[in-house]
Amino acid sequence: MEEYKDTLNLNTTTFSMKGNLSVNEPKTYAKWQEQQVFKRMQNRKDNHGDFTLHDGPPYANGHLHLGHALNKILKDIVVKREYFKGNKIYYTPGWDCHGLPIEQQILERLEKEKTSLENPTLFREKCRDHAKKFLEIQKNEFLQLGVLGDFEDPYKTMDFKFEASIYRALVEVAKKGLLKERHKPIYWSYACESALAEAEVEYKMKKSPSIFVAFGLKKESLEKLKVKKASLVIWTTTPWTLYANVAIALKKDAIYALTQKGYLVAKALHEKLAALGVVDSEIAHEFNANDLEYLKASNPLNQRDSLITLGEHVGLEDGTGAVHTAPGHGEEDYYLGLRYNLEVLMSVDEKGCYDEGIIHNQLLDESYLGEHVFKAQKRIIEQLGDSLLLEQEIEHSYPYCWRTHKPVIYRATTQWFILMDEPFIQNDGSQKTLREVALDAIEKVEFVPSSGKNRLKTMIENRPDWCLSRQRKWGVPLAFFIDKRTNKPCFESEVLEHVAHLFEKKGCDVWWESSVKDLLPPSYQEDATHYEKVMHILDVWFDSGSTFKAVLEDYHGEKGQSPSDVILEGSDQHRGWFQSSLLIGCVLNNQAPFKKVITHGFIVDEKGEKMSKSKGNVVSLDNLLKKHGSDVVRLWVAFNDYQNDLRVSQTFFIQTEQHYKKFRNTLKFLLANFSDMDLKNLERSHNFSPLDHFILEALETISVGVNSAFEEHDFVKGLNVLMAFVTNELSGIYLDACKDSLYCDSKNNEKRQAIQMVLLATASKLCYFLAPILTHTIEEVLEHSQVLCAFLQAKDVFDLKDISVSEKLHLKEFKKPENFEAVLALRSAFNEELDRLKKEGVIKNSLECAIEVKEKALRENLVEELLMVSFVGIAKEKLSETPAFTLFKAPFYKCPRCWRFKSELENTPCKRCEEVLKER
């Protein structure tokens, strides 16, 4: 039989079964960079639409991790998908370069070197160098993921032109009357020694003291109530703020019970408090909260007066119904203070320690000076003496600094804010608040998943004013001058534009380097002594939030359209970049700077737990790339429901590798079996068999399904449809049935050539669908197939377009074989019987079989092809009690060439093979 092997069409391909991705991919990616492939993609002549994905900037600090890979790969898949659809694509990657993490890195380095650097310009220079270094590192790491974009000219928030653009966005906010300097409580990170915006705060569980404290009513107040003894009971988990208490808030119209022992609490909570042992159970008197307003109690910590007020924020679900109020340490307290003209006491310094204000205002004794507020709590509780009614420890959700992971405090300081509820003039002349404009804008944005809409909406509805100022050095300054004569900022256009021009020319380091006089325009320089610089820097969320202006609008469409078609980030950006971009877009243009928001989950381990070095469950991106290659990592991203958290472990990547091998091996089989095609046959029409029509119809059906899923960015759904087709219809049915013709028919046999055209069409569709995900692999496929390139009129992966299979194959319609489902049912029953006979040792394979079927409507040729048997007969009689088919050994000899049992003489070829051999 060996002598016939060379007469078979056992075609091969140079496309390897093993991808050896970690070795070959870097070469491909380097070639793409050298060939400036992204520019070529943008300049493709037949682009028929525009698509802009605006990149949310990663932070230029540290190496990439798997979360970065997830984000950038998803963006790359979305962008490439639009490109292969025929759109002109715009994608400019960018980096967030300013901010605290880089400052901390430099400070730690200086501490190790035992040097200090007071000069802000030199300090900023070190920060800039650090950002440059990691920007290049991350850029190269992104390229190793097969990500394409305008990496030749990425955006960097520290570029001079960019800093000027950020500043001009800030100027627009100021000109519209939405920028105000205020003294009010804000989140304060004592670890960073800086104010924080809401987006920079994360909540964690924290153990805190929970205390109930009695504030005795003053003599005049007791007389008004006509009682001899009464103490309002407050509950707090921040004993350190008691020094700054100036009021107690009650719930309007609520009834308050005075117990026999003289404790005053909300009646609705009395029974609960009595059970805890905070107060006694017998009620002596009841009062309406409205009758208690403006009475005074005494702070047991320092004997200062505490005014009784009514507050809308007071609830009756827990606590005592009497809320400790310190306007210097709480936002609700602050706003209540504005209503009642309360004093704002705040004697805590930048490091979170009590300052000299506690002595000047007689708030605490001198021993507390310089002590950290959290450390001081134990002594404060002891100092309360008999006024402390109950002390417990509770675990509750508490705000933490997201950079240092240390708890934050509320601290009243003078900061700059963007006002959420100040009306400003819209483009149409009407007036709305920023909150109203943002909420209207959200309604016009598409969210994937749709739940993101309500999430962002709720955050905008409830968010406070945006605290913009930071007490740091590495950032864009709030470059305004305060006129010392009026104590107001100078918002004159001439001054502001002059500063913006300086930033564009020299960078914003000039704000630290130059004097006030040198920073002012010539017409203002005579009055330079009347002005002083604001030395705060901007919240970095303002930097990144204004990137749509700097990248899309300032370049007038060269780098994409604004609003962008899509932004795509992790779900945590609802409180970060999505919000900051939305708010700045609504100030500048009265609309969202994006049309669609896509969000993805986080990377977790196989148990669903967050990855951390301390847990030892971090999966290294670098190790994954070395072991599996970037195309496998990309396939893992696409084969997951990215809208939820993605579980990762070596097990999951091994599964993904199996998926990859299935696609690769299928493509290898297809390439090998049309490799001997004459290119002249590509354009002519062919006579396709019923089986060909079956697979072509299936290909058309799944193409609709995959396109629909991909259009909705549901890549896992699309890939599952594609994988099911490859596994079931293609490999499981069609390819097996075609092998005899492919291997054993003559090279120019019409049936074989028709099959090859089907294989070409199938390979084309697989390449088109997989190209956005497995770009390197599809590039490799095309490199190894002149026939496929000719069929697609493509020299490489970037020439790929979707094809119409029916047009390419000159078919008006796909004619699925009649009774095909019946044949498949017969095949299933046959395979069961075949397995039984194999186990019993009766036969070795299906070719030894002949089959007689009782269904006359079934095509004999189709049954023979699908069941891969050597003979099919139709039963003369159709009796209901007989089985659907009868199986018996083929009545002829085995052909030594094709192995079918169709030879009339032993060890001689069958008729078909004889004819093929004659042609040779």
From Swiss-Prot:
Tell me where it resides.
Cytoplasm
User: What keywords were assigned to this record?
Assistant: Aminoacyl-tRNA synthetase, ATP-binding, Cytoplasm, Ligase, Metal-binding, Nucleotide-binding, Protein biosynthesis, Zinc
Give residues annotated as binding Zn(2+): 895, 898, 910, 913
Q: Where are the transmembrane segments?
A: none
Q: Which InterPro entries match?
A: aa-tRNA-synth_I_CS (IPR001412), aa-tRNA-synth_Ia (IPR002300), Anticodon_Ile_BEm (IPR033708), Ile-tRNA-ligase (IPR002301), Ile-tRNA-ligase_type1 (IPR023585), Ile-tRNA_ligase (IPR050081), M/V/L/I-tRNA-synth_anticd-bd (IPR013155), Rossmann-like_a/b/a_fold (IPR014729)
Q: Which GO terms describe its cellular component?
A: cytosol
- SUPFAM superfamilies per UniProt: Anticodon-binding domain of a subclass of class I aminoacyl-tRNA synthetases, Nucleotidylyl transferase, ValRS/IleRS/LeuRS editing domain
Kindly list the positions annotated as binding L-isoleucyl-5'-AMP: 569
What is the UniProt remark on how the cofactor binds and its stoichiometry? Binds 1 zinc ion per subunit.
Write out the GO MF terms.
Answer: aminoacyl-tRNA deacylase activity; ATP binding; isoleucine-tRNA ligase activity; tRNA binding; zinc ion binding
Sequence motif: 'KMSKS' region, positions: 610-614
Cofactor(s) needed by this chain: Zn(2+)
Q: Where is this motif: 'HIGH' region?
A: 58-68
Q: Which EC numbers does the record give?
A: 6.1.1.5
Enzymatic class: ligase
According to its UniProt entry, the protein's GO biological process terms are:
isoleucyl-tRNA aminoacylation
NCBIfam families found in the cross-reference section: ileS
Please quote what the entry notes about the protein's domains: IleRS has two distinct active sites: one for aminoacylation and one for editing. The misactivated valine is translocated from the active site to the editing site, which sterically excludes the correctly activated isoleucine. The single editing site contains two valyl binding pockets, one specific for each substrate (Val-AMP or Val-tRNA(Ile)).
Q: What's its job? A: Catalyzes the attachment of isoleucine to tRNA(Ile). As IleRS can inadvertently accommodate and process structurally similar amino acids such as valine, to avoid such errors it has two additional distinct tRNA(Ile)-dependent editing activities. One activity is designated as 'pretransfer' editing and involves the hydrolysis of activated Val-AMP. The other activity is designated 'posttransfer' editing and involves deacylation of mischarged Val-tRNA(Ile).
Partners and quaternary state? Answer: Monomer.
Stated family: Belongs to the class-I aminoacyl-tRNA synthetase family. IleS type 1 subfamily.
Task: Specify the protein name.
Answer: Isoleucine--tRNA ligase
Per the UniProt record, the source organism is: Helicobacter pylori (strain HPAG1)
Q: What is the lineage of its organism?
A: Bacteria, Pseudomonadati, Campylobacterota, Epsilonproteobacteria, Campylobacterales
Q: Which gene encodes it?
A: ileS
